[in-house]
Swiss-Prot record:
GO molecular function, one term: serine-type endopeptidase activity
Subcellular location: Secreted
Protein name (database record): Carboxy-terminal-processing protease
Organism of provenance: Bartonella bacilliformis (strain ATCC 35685 / KC583 / Herrer 020/F12,63)
Gene (UniProt): ctpA
PTM comment text: May undergo autocatalytic processing at the C-terminus (398-434 or 425-434 missing).
Length: 434
């Protein structure tokens, strides 16, 4: 009994010692941080007082902030008040510009996806293109926000993008006229006995537009004739998390849709489906490719894990991180990566992507042969390395032909839904566990 007490007391002293040590380490770390900040202040003062020309203090500070955020990952950034407003406008589905989703890679702007029916898409800008110049001026050394700011502008104004395209010997100058970009969140059509749903982007209107599209399809195809739906998420760069959750919920009656996990062990949020499948549990085939990112992967991953849909296409982009927009009042906003998201099976797709149940490659037209249209998170410099990421990486070709007749992936989906061909992965086995 005495020995037990002694051990207990020893444990208390040991714990107390560890607490003192931890406090000491914390204090030392804080002191070191303040020293580094003092060093920054010293350098800042020397630059503003000794540089050959008088610099703009605000630009110096903003660029320092951007440098700090860019050192974290490709998706964290600072936005001044004007850029924060532009970001809010884009999530509403309407803004002035070219209509391309871009990221930064090797000091160049890389096109993730041109949005359908926008000036950039009509002018021939392709996923995977690198923008090296804007109106003849090199953009190397600029931040992503600075380059995007130059590409946006009033409708009717011209802009010339100099494009470096893999497989093309010389840079291409593509002239584009800016327009008001009204992103139609959902496009749909009736294909005989099949409902085709294409989600362009996850904006504030995506779920409501999807509801309306499904309702209209159901009014045009009798229930006993409707074979199912094709949900096309190819070239969809993502968008709002809440819209991805609502869209997924439209096809489920129960179960987890997605979970997000932050830096702390208890920093976990789970989102579950509610009763009510809008498609009356009709068969669903989801199409993905290297241009399917973020919110698109949440939808595809959840429907795949719950065996609600069969996924066709090629490996998706692999962006499994969540960005939180932190308002800074009149000083703009901070776009900061705060969590990773996980599919219902507990899988993080960061740097991996969603693997289709049925891999179907889309052949490139002759003029693009030898051109690399592969997109993937794992290729981005400074990306957060996923726990399950391998040398294989993420992503695949990001190309969809304009003519549905040439769309091999889409036609594969139609044939499966109509029973013209069979595959073990369709329909998915609902009894198969994660």
């Amino acid at each position: 009994m005495i020995r037990k007490v002694i051990f207990f007391v020893a444990g208390v002293f040991l714990s107390a010692s560890l607490i003192v040590m931890a406090q000491s380490i914390t204090t030392n770390n804080e002191q070191n941080t303040y020293k580094q900040l003092a060093r920054f202040g010293d350098i800042f003062e020397r630059v503003r007082t000794q540089y050959v020309t008088i610099p703009d203090d605000q630009k110096l500070i903003e660029n320092a902030i951007n440098g700090m955020l860019l050192s974290l990952d490709p998706h964290s950034s600072y936005m001044d008040a004007e850029k924060a407003k532009d970001m809010r406008d884009s999530t509403k589905g309407e803004f002035g510009g070219l209509g391309i989703e871009v990221t930064m890679e090797n000091n160049l702007i890389k096109v993730v996806s041109p949005i359908d029916d926008t000036p950039a898409a009509k002018a021939g800008v392709l996923a995977g293109d690198f923008i090296s110049k804007i109106d003849g001026k090199q953009i190397s050394g600029q931040t992503l926000n600075e380059a995007v700011d130059q590409m946006r502008g009033p409708a009717g104004t011209p802009i010339t993008l100099t494009i470096n395209r893999f497989g093309v010997d010389k840079p291409l100058d593509i002239k584009i006229v800016r327009d008001i970009i009204k992103v139609k969140a959902v496009k749909y059509r009736v294909e005989g006995d099949i409902g085709y749903l294409r989600l362009i982007q996850f904006t504030e209107k995506t779920f409501s537009d999807l509801q309306a599209a499904i309702k209209d399809i159901q009014s045009k195809i009798p229930t006993d004739k409707l074979k199912g739906y094709v949900l096309d998420l190819r070239l969809n760069p993502g968008g709002l998390l809440d819209q991805a959750i609502s869209v997924t919920d439209a096809f489920l009656n129960k179960g987890e849709i997605v979970s997000t996990r932050g830096r702390k062990q208890n920093d976990v949020m789970r989102f579950d489906a509610k009763l009510g499948d809008l498609t009356d549990e009709k068969p669903i085939i989801v199409l993905i490719n290297g241009g399917s990112a973020s919110a698109s992967e949440i939808v595809a991953g959840a429907l795949q894990d719950h065996r609600r849909a069969t996924i066709i296409g090629t490996q998706s982009f692999g962006k499994g991180s969540v960005q939180t927009i932190i308002p800074l009042g009149e000083n703009g906003a901070l776009r900061l990566t705060t969590a990773l998201y996980y599919t219902p099976s507990g899988t993080s797709i960061q740097g991996i992507g969603i693997t289709p149940d049925i891999v179907v490659e889309q052949p490139l037209p002759e003029k693009y042969k030898g051109y690399d249209v592969t997109l993937g998170e794992s290729e981005l410099r400074g990306h957060i390395k996923g726990k399950q990421e391998s040398d294989k990486g993420s992503g695949s070709a990001a190309f969809v032909p304009r003519d549905p007749k040439d769309d091999v992936q889409l036609n594969e989906a139609y044939k499966l839904l109509r029973g013209e061909i069979t595959h073990a992965a369709f329909p998915p086995d609902p009894n198969k566990v994660f």
